[in-house]
UniProtKB/Swiss-Prot annotation:
Organism, scientific name: Buchnera aphidicola subsp. Baizongia pistaciae (strain Bp)
Function (record text): IF-3 binds to the 30S ribosomal subunit and shifts the equilibrium between 70S ribosomes and their 50S and 30S subunits in favor of the free subunits, thus enhancing the availability of 30S subunits on which protein synthesis initiation begins.
Gene giving rise to this polypeptide: infC
GO-annotated biological processes: ribosome disassembly
Recorded GO MF terms: ribosome binding; translation initiation factor activity
Upper classification of the organism: Bacteria, Pseudomonadati, Pseudomonadota, Gammaproteobacteria, Enterobacterales
Xref: InterPro entries: T_IF-3_C_sf, T_IF-3_N_sf, Translation_initiation_fac3_CS, Translation_initiation_fac_3, Translation_initiation_fac_3_C, Translation_initiation_fac_3_N
Name of the protein in its database record: Translation initiation factor IF-3
Keyword match Manganese: no
SUPFAM superfamilies cross-referenced by the UniProt entry: Translation initiation factor IF3, C-terminal domain (SSF55200), Translation initiation factor IF3, N-terminal domain (SSF54364)
Main location: cytoplasm
Length: 181
């Protein structure tokens, strides 16, 4: 299936609530976050029912476990809402690739450079691949000149992350990152 929205994983009860709590005594915190102290589980459940809320085990590993009186449904909703907000704020950085040849003509060079600029302005990383074919391997200096030209043309927009020192296989790879954050 293509497209569509990614389903956000629903948080399944990470905390024990009400009668699921197994400890005899708990360290209780009320709705406002005030420490009530160490009380029996029975009295903590009674206080939670009195206010019409749930008793939620916050820290099960401490001795005695820390429990808080709260509306558990609202707590889960707020937690999932904050996770959604964090995902919205994240920018996925893609790596775009543009391929050059040592003898790329001026018109093609300008078109590819324009695409490089567009990718960098969108905040993506760009992988510039310079490919050698046949006897072009003899003229590696031309390839380095092309990469240096790209580097100098994009000096205001991009930072060079990786610059090739030698040919790897039949290609040279340079990786550029956008300067603006």
């Amino acid at each position: 299936m293509k497209g569509g929205k990614k389903k956000i994983q629903i948080i399944t009860k990470p905390n024990k609530i009400n009668h699921e709590i197994g400890a005899e005594k708990v360290r209780l915190t009320d709705v406002n976050g005030r420490q009530i102290g160490i009380v029996t589980l029975k009295s903590a459940l009674y206080k939670a029912e009195e206010v019409g809320m749930d008793l939620v085990e916050i820290s099960p590993n401490s001795e005695p476990p820390v429990c808080r009186i709260m509306n558990y449904g609202k707590f889960l909703y707020e937690k999932s809402k904050s996770i959604k907000e964090q995902r919205k704020k994240q920018k996925v950085r893609n790596i775009k690739e543009i391929k050059f040849r040592p003898n790329t003509d001026e018109g093609d060079y300008k078109v590819k450079l324009r695409n490089l600029v567009r990718f960098l302005e969108e905040g993506d990383k760009v992988k510039v691949t310079l490919r050698f074919r046949g006897r072009e391997m003899v003229h590696q200096k031309l390839g380095i000149d092309v990469l240096n030209r790209i580097k100098s043309d994009l000096i205001e927009l991009a930072v060079v992350e990786v610059f090739p020192s030698r040919v790897e296989g039949r290609q040279m790879i340079m990786i550029l990152t956008s300067k603006k954050k």
